[in-house]
């Protein structure tokens, strides 16, 4: 059942990275934030 907890952790990590991606996208469309963010190109 280690595999089951690995699956849960992977799902949590996917959700966390989705949230980061949404936050970065929102920041990059907002000029005062985009200017400060190295993640916006």
Swiss-Prot record:
Example of a GO cellular component annotation carried by this entry: extracellular region
Record flagged with keyword Disulfide bond: yes
Predominant location: secreted
UniProt entry keywords in alphabetical sequence: Disulfide bond, Ion channel impairing toxin, Neurotoxin, Secreted, Toxin
GO molecular function: acetylcholine receptor inhibitor activity; ion channel regulator activity; toxin activity
Tissue expression from the record: Expressed by the venom duct.
InterPro entries from the UniProt entry: Conotoxin_a-typ (IPR009958)
UniProt free text on domains: The cysteine framework is I (CC-C-C). Alpha4/6 pattern.
Organism in which the protein naturally occurs: Conus bullatus (Bubble cone)
Cystines in this chain: 27-33, 28-40
Superkingdom of source: Eukaryota
Proregion positions: 1-25
Annotated protein name in UniProt: Conotoxin Bu22
Key word Hydrolase present: no
Family indicated by similarity: Belongs to the conotoxin A superfamily.
Subcellular location: Secreted
């Amino acid at each position: 059942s280690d595999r089951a907890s690995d699956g849960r952790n992977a799902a949590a990590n996917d959700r966390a990275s989705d949230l980061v991606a949404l936050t970065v996208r929102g920041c990059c469309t907002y000029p005062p934030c985009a200017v400060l963010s190295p993640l916006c190109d």
